[in-house]
């Protein structure tokens, strides 16, 4: 009986989803493919850029716990699925 109980406990632990970690893109270029695993608690991917610099400079991508605030002429896109901040 103890063996059966122990087996059930082990199977339960192995099968549990012990947590999900978001992955976001991080790089300063307009076109990006560098993937980063977010820290625990960071559940937002974002892409932020200055609308005056549309030719690819001034991009910031990353993970955050909340969507960053707008400043000056920034454009910010926030999302919550893997690599959604393309």
From Swiss-Prot:
InterPro entries the record matches: Snake_3FTx (IPR003571), Snake_toxin-like_sf (IPR045860), Snake_toxin_con_site (IPR018354), Toxin_cobra-type (IPR054131)
Record key words, sorted: Acetylcholine receptor inhibiting toxin, Disulfide bond, Ion channel impairing toxin, Neurotoxin, Postsynaptic neurotoxin, Secreted, Signal, Toxin
Top-level lineage group: Eukaryota
Signal sequence coordinates: 1-21
Subcellular location: Secreted
GO molecular function, one term: acetylcholine receptor inhibitor activity
UniProt tissue specificity: Expressed by the venom gland.
Protein family according to the UniProt entry: Belongs to the three-finger toxin family. Ancestral subfamily. Orphan group II sub-subfamily.
Its job: Binds with low affinity to muscular (alpha-1-beta-1-delta-epsilon/CHRNA1-CHRNB1-CHRND-CHRNE) and very low affinity to neuronal (alpha-7/CHRNA7) nicotinic acetylcholine receptor (nAChR).
Protein name: Probable weak neurotoxin NNAM3
